[in-house]
Amino acid sequence: TDVSLVFEGGVTYNSGSVTIPGGIENLVFVGVASDAGELPVLEIPTISLKEVMNGITFENVHLDGLNDGKNYLFGIGNSSCFRSISFTGCTIAHYNRSILRFNTDKLEIDEILFDDCMITDIAHDGYGMIVFGKAQTRVGLVSVTKSTLTEMGSLMQLNDGIEKVVMDQCIVYNNTFATKNYYRIDKQPGAISVTNTIFAGSNNGQKFNATYSNYSTYFLFTSSYMTSDIIIDRYGFTDITPYSGTSEDLFVDPANGDFHLKSTAKFPGKETAGDPRWW
């Protein structure tokens, strides 16, 4: 059975934690924006599955975890998982640990997609936005594209069985929150690339590692940029292009969420790097 749930823009739906019952093969959460362009707000601390599903889709909704304890939007702890999941045109906020955490092994997942999203305040209590805590049978693709990520803990923890990881045309900015590292790779994926992405922000004045350990032989940040207010501890962004100015020199008002480029920025990645919503 395929099910679509349609939500009205400008309305807040406080459903509490959700359990998807058995018998649903594909489930879509879709928002219809209000006349003012507002998305529906879905206040969902966590979602669990009763059995294996084919696909889960979120489109044009605001997902708010309410920082409800040590929460994950999806904390997959057994074989009841999806074959694919996608977030398109969404805003996602306030999940203390992860959006997606896989704490069981031998899963088969075709793809995990985030596209055209605004994501903030994730993984402040450890873990990361996407976490594979154990080896998997196969994960075809993990993709994060055309998105703005702010005040983030770790972005990804990767493990055995992942074929391809792509991050392209994103902005990653930490100002008030201090992460320790963005990427942890416990087992090298088949392919991994972070391209046309801008890393920015003072990280609350704290130095940090781009990666948990040294992956420089295979993990490159070609055609990506890093602002001068970032202070690297030990492991940096291999092959990244430094930008001579700070986040405030590059963006109009990053501390308040405006990542349009300043006309005075003289940024070589203009209209190629970063989230296209700000071009």
Spans of model-derived segments:
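Glycine-rich repeat segments that build the extracellular carbohydrate-interaction surface of secreted
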Residues: 1-14, 26-35
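Extracellular beta-rich repeat passengers
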Residues: 18-258, 265-279
